Regions:
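Solvent-exposed residues in well-ordered beta-strands and their adjoining turns
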Residues: 68, 193-197
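A structural signal for short, well-ordered beta-strand segments
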Residues: 44, 140, 190-194
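A short acidic/glycine-rich loop-to-helix N-cap element
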Residues: 201-202
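Residue-level marker for buried hydrophobic side chains located in beta-strands
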Residues: 78-80, 171, 197
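Acidic/histidine-rich catalytic neighborhood of metal-dependent amide-processing enzymes
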Residues: 115-189
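N-terminal helical capping/dimerization or prosegment-like subdomains
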Residues: 2-79, 83-89
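Active-site metal-coordination/substrate-binding segment of hydrolases
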Residues: 75-139
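Acidic-glycine-rich active-site phosphate/pyrophosphate-binding loop
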Residues: 87-103, 166-167, 182-193
Length: 202
């Protein structure tokens, strides 16, 4: 198959998967199990192993799936990471936000950009990874409730620690206007102690 045909196939498969993903109404705080089942099914058919972690109510789910390297080595794995939840729908939509609509070569639907589009691309490429002579593991990490407080990711991270799954190169497919971003804002809290004499100058 030519490179051009491969690209066409990848594009069409990405659009098909994205169309399916948009159809899952995974608003933050709501059940995302059906979407996780869909993703897990695609990956397991390709030979991936997976496990899940949950919120306290067992209705919101993280998925962590792995396509193993063909040979044993110490190369760091690649982690393709994305969140499955979307923000609630506001007014102003001219089409059903949970039905993918293509207009003027653009695809519209809640979460199409942030960030079901990346998840669709990762899943569309998975068959290529599964047939390749991988020299490192490829992980797929799909989490819940990023939009509200990044609730799902810490639960998954604790399970990764418990299973002693080593860190690696993590690609988080958030929309960035096609720019590579190698850092993100965050916060850290410090408690400090000082010794000395109080003073003031003006």
């Amino acid at each position: 198959m030519s490179t051009e045909n491969n690209l066409d196939l990848l594009f069409n498969n990405s659009v098909k998967i994205l169309t399916d993903l948009i159809g899952f109404k995974t608003i933050s705080g709501e059940d995302n199990t059906a979407l996780i089942n869909y993703c897990d099914d695609i990956l397991k058919k390709l030979g991936a192993t997976s496990f899940r972690t949950y919120d306290d109510e067992k209705k919101r789910v993280n998925l962590f799936a792995t396509l193993k390297a063909k040979s044993s080595n110490n190369k760091k794995p690649i982690i393709l990471s994305g969140h499955t939840d979307v923000v609630p729908v506001s007014k102003g939509w001219s089409s059903d936000p949970f039905t993918a609509t293509i207009k003027d070569d653009k695809l519209y639907g809640r979460g199409s950009c942030d960030m079901k589009g990346f998840i669709a691309c990762a899943l569309a490429y998975a068959p290529i990874y599964s047939k390749s002579n991988l020299d490192r593991d490829i992980h797929f990490s799909f989490t819940f409730d990023e939009e509200t407080a990044c609730i799902g990711a810490p639960i998954l991270i604790e399970e990764l620690k418990r299973r002693n799954i080593k860190d690696g190169i993590c690609i988080v497919g958030e929309p960035t206007n096609m720019k590579i971003i190698d850092a993100h804002k965050g916060c850290y809290e410090y408690t400090t102690h000082f010794k000395g004499l109080a003073g003031h100058s003006s």
